[in-house]
């Protein structure tokens, strides 16, 4: 049944999204530095005739950067995307996309006016058909060439400043693998020189917003590819895990019986080929990953360097991260202390919040623990566990946002490592998104997590809000009732006082009780109250 669904999907759909729009990679586009493709609905650039958007100059932030990358004009990702384009579509209202043909996250419908909240669920809560459908969608993405996007296989300089385009087709799944490689690759300085201390999505403030957008775009493309608008990425809750409980053939793949570094032949993913994993080879040739298959997925969970990562994260580790009030601190890189981002990413201890270069914890611990393809930053997205892992990391980010409710100004405006300032555009996304745009609640982006819905403090606020609104509507009646009650209380108190005086006159003074009867005391107390 699963194979029948998969083959049906493979023959039915051809779509994608990700990096360089196919419509914008001609020599004309590259030399004119313009990416404003027509929207299919009216054939005008950016859907301008329909009011969806228009072609505009890109306004880049001039906020100062941190000292980690001491070069200028040597890397295509600097001041993204200005090396390739200085004009792109600027979409209006709730429209989004490289040609304004899509809706912003959280909006649906032909005019993008409908709000919708999707829920990401624990993979262990999926039924067998739901789980098999998820695996079928992954395989479909792995076998569907993108009709919308291509990947560059050379630098802008190697393309002779755009006059000789160098781009390849790629399937949808590997497109996102390539994006994760490209955003974290070393800087190629020419000759045999490289610069390793550069990463536009890790080791700095944009780590969490970048991966949030990455998952949203991945999710959105699977929805388009399959026609399943309710699709969401499941998460793996790894808190307190003693082993990789999703590393079975029923889920993400068990171990090969004769080669522990490979997946079991019975695994859904055992035949997958990986891409973008040979970083040193690319560096030595001053070249980019071109999407060529490079061998099978490798994974040997638990047989890693235990001196660096002695255990998987605990619930207490997560709670300590959430208790940290600062999103970012100090140098805003992997040496930051008491930084929620740096602690969750795994460069600071989840016991103290102090940066520790000798240990890999939290998010990093899972990558190290997998001991294979997922353990290398650039190629880690080849392993589909990457999606489940980062969905859960994003849920922890969401918990922190809900607990501390930071203003957007909490996200650093300046002096972060290159590509990580609040107004910097995220590499390598087209359409363009800023880091600060995703420093907001997931609900504002149209999704939530199943395990957060039960504990969300907002749910109590929403529950009581209706009662407060009703109270405001009947406030004048309540005020009038209170005044009448006060008058009646005063009259009753006067009557009780008269009765007491009359009683004192009837009893000799020495026979009068020191206290009233219990019932009388209660009535008087309540009346005075």
From Swiss-Prot:
Cytoplasmic side, ranges: 498-529
GO molecular function: metal ion binding; protein homodimerization activity; tyrosinase activity
Glycosylated residues (UniProt): 86, 111, 161, 230, 337, 371
Name assigned to this protein: Tyrosinase
Species in which this protein is naturally found: Gorilla gorilla gorilla (Western lowland gorilla)
Residues the entry annotates as binding Cu cation A: 180, 202, 211
Keyword match Zinc: no
Signal peptide: 1-18
Record text on cofactor binding: Binds 2 copper ions per subunit.
């Amino acid at each position: 049944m699963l194979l029948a669904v998969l083959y049906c999907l493979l023959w039915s759909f051809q779509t994608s999204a990700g990096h360089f729009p196919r419509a914008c990679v001609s020599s004309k586009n590259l030399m004119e530095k313009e990416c404003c493709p027509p929207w299919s609905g009216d054939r005008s650039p950016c859907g301008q005739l329909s009011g969806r958007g228009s072609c505009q100059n890109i306004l880049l932030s001039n906020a100062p950067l941190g000292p980690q990358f001491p070069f200028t004009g040597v890397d295509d990702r600097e001041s993204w995307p200005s090396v390739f384009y200085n004009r792109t579509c600027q979409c209006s209202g709730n429209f989004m996309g490289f040609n304004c043909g899509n809706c912003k996250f959280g909006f649906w419908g032909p005019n993008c006016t409908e709000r919708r909240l999707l829920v990401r669920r624990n993979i262990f809560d999926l039924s067998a058909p739901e789980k098999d459908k998820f695996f079928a969608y992954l395989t479909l993405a792995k076998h569907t060439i993108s009709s919308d996007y291509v990947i560059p296989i050379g630098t802008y300089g190697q393309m002779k400043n755009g006059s000789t385009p160098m781009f390849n087709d790629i399937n949808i799944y590997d497109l996102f693998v390539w994006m994760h490689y490209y955003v974290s690759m070393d800087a190629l300085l020419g000759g045999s020189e490289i610069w390793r201390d550069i990463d536009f999505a890790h080791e700095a403030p944009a780590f969490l917003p970048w991966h949030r957008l990455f998952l949203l775009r991945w999710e959105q493309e699977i929805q388009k590819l399959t026609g399943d608008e309710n699709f969401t990425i499941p998460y793996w809750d790894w808190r307190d895990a003693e082993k990789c409980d999703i590393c079975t053939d029923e889920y993400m793949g068990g171990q090969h019986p004769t080669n522990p570094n490979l997946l079991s032949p019975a695994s859904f993913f055992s035949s997958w080929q990986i891409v973008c994993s040979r970083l040193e080879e690319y560096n030595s040739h001053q070249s980019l990953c071109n999407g060529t298959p490079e061998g099978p997925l490798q994974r040997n969970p638990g047989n890693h360097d235990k001196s660096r990562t002695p255990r998987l994260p605990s619930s207490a580790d997560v709670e300590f991260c959430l208790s940290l009030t600062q999103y970012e601190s100090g140098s805003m890189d992997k040496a930051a202390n008491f930084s929620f981002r740096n602690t969750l990413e795994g460069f600071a201890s989840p016991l103290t919040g102090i940066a520790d270069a000798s240990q890999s914890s939290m998010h990093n611990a899972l990558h190290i623990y997998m001991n294979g393809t997922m353990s290398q930053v650039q190629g880690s997205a080849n392993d589909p566990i990457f999606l489940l892992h980062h969905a859960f990391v994003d849920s922890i980010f969401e918990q922190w946002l809900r607990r501390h409710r930071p203003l957007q100004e909490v996200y650093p405006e300046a002096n972060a490592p290159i590509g990580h300032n609040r107004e910097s555009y995220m590499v390598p996304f087209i359409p363009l998104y800023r880091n600060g745009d995703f420093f907001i609640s997931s609900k504002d982006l149209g999704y939530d997590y199943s395990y957060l819905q039960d504990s969300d403090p907002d749910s109590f606020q929403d529950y009581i809000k209706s009662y407060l609104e009703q109270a405001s509507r009947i406030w004048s009646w309540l005020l009038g009732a209170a005044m009448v009650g006060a008058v009646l209380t005063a009259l009753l108190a006067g009557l009780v006082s008269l009765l007491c005086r009359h009683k004192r006159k009837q009893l000799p003074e020495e026979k009068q009780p020191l206290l009233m009867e219990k019932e009388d005391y209660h009535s008087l107390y309540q009346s005075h109250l």
